[in-house]
Amino acid sequence: NANDDLRRILILAFVSGILELGLDVNDYKILLDIQDIERVIRRNKNCGDIVDVKRGNIMVKSSIIAKELMMKTEIFSTNEVFNVLIAIMNKLDNLYLGSDKYKNVMINLVSCSYLSYVFGYQMESNKFIEYYENVKELNFCKKNLFFWEQYAIVCINLKQFDRAGRYFKTAYSLAKQRGHLFSAYQIDNHYARYLLENQLYYRKKEGSLDVFVEAHRLLNKNSEIDIIKKNSRYYKYRVARAYKDYYDTFASKYEESDKDIFLKRCEEMYSSLIQYKRGLDNDEIRRDVRECESALKYILDSENRLS
């Protein structure tokens, strides 16, 4: 009915406005299967305060207001929003080949960080998992490394580590198919986070040093990428903030020889971070980098290893 059509239009308009998807009226007609979109919007007097329809575009007047409304579940339930997004993803799956715009929309709609942003980082575990489960068999998703990496990240965020491990395995398998020249630096960083957080969550001291050594190796194996992709160089420091919790939980209680292995890697990360900071102005240094520096200083100070 007309009210249902209006709600679907507004949900897509809000998501598109928040994520800047660049969809026009024709895209709305195709993706929502509603041909009289302009009339549906204009027939509702209150819509004029929220969205504009002009020059073939549907514009949200304020992405901030759109975000506030998306977070109010009494207006749009999470279930309703995800149902609209699932229907749109199914439509896009038949349209994205040959369309960079639609391909980009699909990338946005499976990005963990973007979806979390739409919902104000209020993640309901069952709803997010249901969403990814509903779209994982789409042609765009099932062989898509980015999709499985994002699904794994969602599972880490929701502390579903067994699932995360399976989906990282799928992502690495797809990365391997791209050949030895493909760099999996992004997956490596997220997988390192998975290794550390999984070990911390279950408080498993047995094997914890081996896990730490592997996580540290993954964070540091892509030094050439650190140089080329300057915008992504902070990723490993964001993950390495967990070294402090790892020290408090496990490493502070290690035998001296094992503790030395741990501390040498902390020194290596600290040296790398200081070198990284030298290339930045003070206002360019991200908060997570500062937090990592503080965490590493805490560890090295505690063991009198800070020169």
What kind of feature is each model-predicted range?
Residues 16-163, 167-174, 178, 185-186:
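C-terminal leucine-rich, beta-strand-based interaction scaffolds used for sensing/assembly
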Residues 85-88, 123-138, 162-174, 203-226, ...:
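Alpha-helical repeat scaffolds
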Residues 109-118, 150-151, 191, 198, ...:
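Structural register within alpha-helical repeat arrays
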Residues 141-142, 182, 230, 234:
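Residue signature of alpha-solenoid helical repeat architecture, marking inter-repeat boundaries
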Residues 147, 185-189, 232-242, 285:
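The tetratricopeptide repeat
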Residues 272-307:
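Terminal, low-structured helical/coil segments at or just beyond the last alpha-helical repeat
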